C-alpha cells in the first residue's frame, strides 16, 4: 500500500518537473532562481518529502506569473516588474513586443544599471526605478523622447548624465543617492520640469542655470551639504522650497521677492540671517526680516558712497541710439517732471536746476523734441580753437515769461572729423527798446571732472564723476582759503548791436592736471511754443525788433541765486552766423573749484575756479525786453525779478549761509547726543540716527520729561534683538503724541519717517531740543537738565527754515 502511494507521488513530481522545464525552455531560461536543470532537480526531489513538492509548485506559479505579466504588458502597455529581485531584464524574444510600453515599473529589484532594453521603449512616459542598485545610466536614455516622469530614488548614482536634460521631463526624483552635483544642462528643462527632488544627496553647490527653470514649482534640497543658496534660485516661481538639514548660514535678500512661495522649510540650518528662532514662526516673519535687512543694507550702501542722510540718489543716465546720455527727467512733460530737490536736502535757488552733484547729462540735439536749433544752424558754428582744448557748446533759448520756461540739460555733439569749435558766449541785456545791449568778456571754464578724450582723429565725450555733497563741502573750504579772484570785469561796449559780428578771443584755460582735453557742462533753457514761434512768427532775423534777456551767474559755486547777481553784461560773438536762422542761448553751470586752479578773473569773494560762460547766438523775440524782465523758473507759478543793486561783497551770502547751516547741524547733533547720554545714562554709537529708529530711546526721553507720557514702550526681546517695523512705528507715534501733549510746537515736531528711515536726525534733534527747552522752562525736571537745551530755540527755527525745500527769497 505504501509502495503504491510513493509511486503516485513520484509520478506527480516528475510531471511537475517536466512542465517547469518546458516553461523555462520557452523563453524564461535566464530568469534568476530558475534554470535548465530544474527538471533533474525536481526528479531528484522525488526522493524527498511532500513539502518539497509543494515549494516547487509555488515556484512554478511564480514563473507562470512572469510570463503572464509580459503578456499583459504586450497588450496593455504597462510593464509591472516590481519587487522581483531581478538583476537583468527578462528576455522576451519574439513572442512579446514591449516597444509600445507607456508605463514601466522596475522598482525594488537589483538592477545595477538602467537596462538597455528599456531605452528602446520610444513611447515610454513613466519610468520607476527606485530601490535598486543603479550606479550608471547609459547615454541611450536620450532615446526616451516621450519620458515625462523619472523616479531614480534610493539608488547609488554619483552623477546624472547630461542626456537626461534633453528629455521632456516634468518630474525628476533623484533623492537618496550619492550625487555631488547636478548637471549644468539642467536649464534645458525650463519648459517642462515642475518637480525636482534632489534631497538626501551630497550636493555642495547648485548649477548656475537652475534659475532658468521657470516652470519649476517644487524643489527639495533637504539633507545636502549646501552652504548658501544662489541668487539665481530666487528667480524661480516656486510654490514649495525645502532646504532643511543643510549648512546654510544666511538667506539671500532677494528671496523676499518670491511672491509665489507658499511653503519654505528651513529647519536644522545654522541660520544667522534670519535667526533660526525667527524662521520657526513662518514664512511671513522671514520675509519681513529680509525686507528690513534690505532696507538697512541700502542705507549702508548710500553711506558707503559718501552720501549723507539727506542725499537724493538719482537715476543712472540712459543712452539713446546715437550714444549720447539722456537724463531720465527730460522725458515726457518737462514742466511736470523737473526735479526741485537738491542733494543737500534743501533748496535755496529760485526754481532753477542747481544741484550739488552734477549728473552731466548729454543729449543729441537732433533727438530732442524741445530743441529749436536745426542741423544747418549747428553746422555754422566756427571751429577755431586749438585741438588741445575740447569743449562742448551750451545752448540756451532765452525765456521771457516764467510760466512757460523750463530747463533741459543738453550738450552739442561735435562731428568726429571736425575740429573743436570755438565757443564765445555773449551776455545780452537789452534796454527797454532793445537797441543798445552791452558787451562782456568771455570766461573759460576748466572743468575738473569731465574730459573729452581725443585719439586717432576722433573726439569722444566722457561723463564726469558725480560730485558728492562731501566733496562739495571740501571745495567750499578750499574756496574760502584761497585768495585768488574768480572773475574780472571789463568795460562794456555800448556801440555793439545784437546783430554785429565781432570776434572775442577766449581766455586760455589753465589745466592743472596736464590734460589735453576739456569738457564744458551743458544746460539749455527752453521756451514754450507760445512764446517763440518755430515756423516763422518768432524766428530770428537781421532786423529783429528784440533780443533775449540772458542772465549769467557770477558765482563760483553751484548754488546760484538770481537775486544776488550784481549786474548783467551783454556781449555778442562774431563766430556764429545767426542772420537767417534761429539759434539758442545757453550758459554753463559754475563748478566747484580745483585745488591748483588759477584764474585771471577777480571778484570779491575769491575762488580758484575758471568758468566759461556765454551765449552761442541770440534769438530774435517779437516783443522788446527790459533789463528787469522776469526770467521763467522751473516752477511755473513763481517769477523771479533780477536784482542788479546788490553790492559785490554780498555775493558770498549763499556760501556763508551754507557754513552757518553746517555749524548749526553739528551743534544740534552734539546737543542731541548730550541730552540722551546725560539724561538716560547711556552711550550712543557714532550713527545716532540708526540708534533712534526703533523709537525706544525717544520714548524714554519723553517719559523723562513727563513721567508716564508714553504708557507702553515696545522693547526688543532677548531672542530677537530688533523690533518689527510695526512696533517701531508704534513707538515713534507714541513719542510724537507725547511731544504734542507736552506742548511742543507742531511746526517743530518731526515726522515719523524722519525717525524710522534714519534720514532726519536733524529734525529729530530739533524736536528733542524743543522738548527739553519746554522741560527746563516748566521746571519739571532738575535744574541743570535744561542747560543743554536752552540755546535750541533760535538755531532750531533757523535750521528748519534753511532745511525747508521751499526756495528762499
Swiss-Prot record:
User: Basic and acidic residues bias: where?
Assistant: 351-368
Indicate the principal place this protein occupies in or around the cell: cytoplasm
Q: Which gene encodes it?
A: Lrch
Mind telling me which GO cellular component terms the entry cites? cell cortex; cleavage furrow; cytoskeleton
Q: What is the protein named?
A: Leucine-rich repeat and calponin homology domain-containing protein
Physiological role: May play a role in the stabilization of the actin-rich cell cortex during cell division.
Calponin-homology (CH) domain boundaries? 662-776
Q: What is the lineage of its organism?
A: Eukaryota, Metazoa, Ecdysozoa, Arthropoda, Hexapoda
Q: Which organism is it from?
A: Drosophila melanogaster (Fruit fly)
Tell me the null mutant phenotype: Embryos homozygous for a null allele of the gene are viable and do not display gross developmental defects, developing to adult stage, albeit with a slightly decreased viability. Homozygous females are sterile, laying rare embryos that display no sign of development. Mutant flies display increased lethality at extreme temperatures.
**Comp. bias (Gly residues):** 34-44
> Is Cytoplasm a UniProt keyword of this protein?
yes
